[in-house]
Amino acid sequence: MKILWFAHRDIKHPKAGGAERTIYEVGRRLVKLGVDMYLVTVNPGNLLNYEVVDGIKTYRTKGNIRAHLNVRKMLRRIEPDAIIDDMDHALPWCSPWFTNKRVIVFFRHLHARSLPGQVNIVLAKIITFIEKMYPSIYKNNIFVTESNTSENDLIHLGIKKENIIRIPPGVDLKLFHPGEKTKIVQLLYFGGLRKYKRPGYAIKVYEDLYNEIKDLKLIITGDGPILNELKEKIKDKNYNIDFLGKIDYNTLAEIIRESWVNLHFSVTEGWGYSLLESSASGTPSVAFRVPGVVDTVKNDYNGFLVGNINEFRSKILYIIKNEELFIKNSRKFAENYTWEKTAKMWYDLLNNNVDNR
């Protein structure tokens, strides 16, 4: 079975995140299951135009526009048995316009919900309009999504429920596992430093607890457009806050493992990848009760879902007092999600849709 996956980024892209992790983890496991796996993506300028990454034959085109213009060419060149159009960046690949074969659409989340404050009003309206066109572009094709939230968003857009399949992501349970916590209480924020992720709240939470927890420490990892703004907030403060920037995956796993509580403030998620990695590491999360996150945090089990920023303080203090129970429950929750299970679900779906139109 030959599969062609269109996506805007791959695992080696400097801005790769949870979405690209899914492509990589699923893709390399599909290869082991005998799939001839092709990935067509965008070259940020510093990567090879072609290379094989753990069995995934990766073609990179310079520029988003050129990548989209190459869809027909790549379909003819590779002649796949099944196609995946990955919608992590909203702009559709429109593969059904160039092939009669079944196209599977990988819908991550509704971008319209996270656009305010990220792009100008005109661009926000354009992206929102494009998302509303999905039912027309991908009429009668299968949509795969990861969460109940995203499934409901698709139905709201006009996609038939019978054309939607939920395949949750997995987590590397060997890399992300419980371990010894730091001697002093260490809070963690890890993820993109963008406005809709609201990482600035991490500093607010730290300040709320500063006089209650001795030697309290906060670690903020990741990169993004508001990094300098966050640093500016604390430059004259005597806070124990470290900005680590973008770090490698193994180092990230170690930091998550040793932290006491993971903080999450995003406006919305398709699926909370970081929340699942934190849970696997025995590190509970406190997060806002927002779309996508509600699928990844079970209230009062592997963390807490709250309605406003002022609730973070009491929930963190409660977790600290009941640390061992939350470590145990967090790991138990994550053990339901493995990349092997996710890849098998993808394999069965793809296999059932080859030449089945």
Segments from the language model and where they lie:
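Membrane-proximal helix-turn-helix segments that form the acceptor-binding/catalytic region
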Residues: V122-V144
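Short hydrophobic beta-strand element within catalytic cores of glycosyltransferases
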Residues: L275, P284-A287
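Aromatic "clamp/platform" in nucleotide-sugar-dependent glycosyltransferases that forms part
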Residues: V267
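Conserved acidic donor-binding segment of nucleotide-sugar-dependent glycosyltransferases
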Residues: N299-N310, Y318-N322
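Carbohydrate-associated surface elements
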Residues: T149, G170
